[in-house]
From Swiss-Prot:
Cited Pfam families: Amidase_3
GO biological process: peptidoglycan catabolic process
Organism: Clostridium perfringens (strain 13 / Type A)
GO molecular function, one term: N-acetylmuramoyl-L-alanine amidase activity
Domain MurNAc-LAA: residue ranges: 3-174
UniProt cross-references to PANTHER family, sorted A to Z: AUTOLYSIN PH-RELATED, N-ACETYLMURAMOYL-L-ALANINE AMIDASE
GO cellular component labels: outer membrane-bounded periplasmic space
Similarity comment: family membership: To C.perfringens pIP404 ORF10.
Protein name: Uncharacterized protein CPE1502
Amino acid sequence: MKIAVRGGHNFKAKGALGIIDETIENRKVYKALIKYLNIAGHNVIDVTPGECDVNTDLYLGVQKAEDNNSELFLSIHFDKAYDRYEGALGTGTWIYGRGGKAEIYAKRIVDNLSKGTGLKNRGVKENSKLYELRKTSMPAVLVEVCFCEATEDVRIYREKGPDLIGKLIAEAINEKEIEENIKPEGQEDSLKEKFLKSTNTKAIANLDPRDNPSSIYKDLGEIYKGERIRVLPEICDNKDYLPIIYWKDTTNIESQKVWVSAKQNYLKIDTNATVINVVTELDARYIKSQRSSKMGYVKNGERLYVHKIESGYALGTYFASNGYKTAWFTAKYISLD
């Protein structure tokens, strides 16, 4: 079955905030849901938009589901009713109206979540005003995992974890237990570990992976604050964007080349080298030649990340004014750590 899955809200149009943050937690749950639906053999479409206002967020999510002719739409949320609540409020699902496939899926989901976690079962409720339910042509279910401010809900959620929540939702759709693919012990971890060892940059804010280095782009996913990525070893004279690769948890593979913001308030590039013995400045060049035109420069004592050294030149990513660039530098003026 072709299933559209959406993580509710985004970090620009944030969701509920209580003991836990809805936007942060539903990103964990929806990724787990996608993982288990994929394992079960479903064709899963991630319809979670990037950072945008609430109306755009809702529109893009539904439109992508429609454009892909999805057969089921699932949206993951966390609820909130009070500033703080001592006790349990529970898990529930919302549908547009009674009597269709959406109600069947919604009941299976809420029952399985409650049974599998111990969360109070709030049942299936109707709401014909919610955008995701009234604008979708396929059966649609909005899942409220639990209440952000309810102490017992949060205790259970933290104890059980987002991976189990995603698994229980997927198994409710699948109508049978889903087992993770059996692979040699440690194989998947080693793939990710190998990638992480090759990274050279930390995201210090949430990033949109773009298909091109401009403000008009296709959003290819989500890179969250704190994630490690790899800036690619290629010449880049665009202080607004850098070419990178990131790890896609939902499919457990490296991404293809994408572009992200190169601004210093979005990225923190690792450094492994220092500029030395420079009297004035060291030119950043487009090619490995003294005849190359000048991209920019670095000064004595500046730090940068060197990707490789070839023919007496070091390819390095450096901070240029208000964004990072990658260029060739005369290697004898670069001291590796």
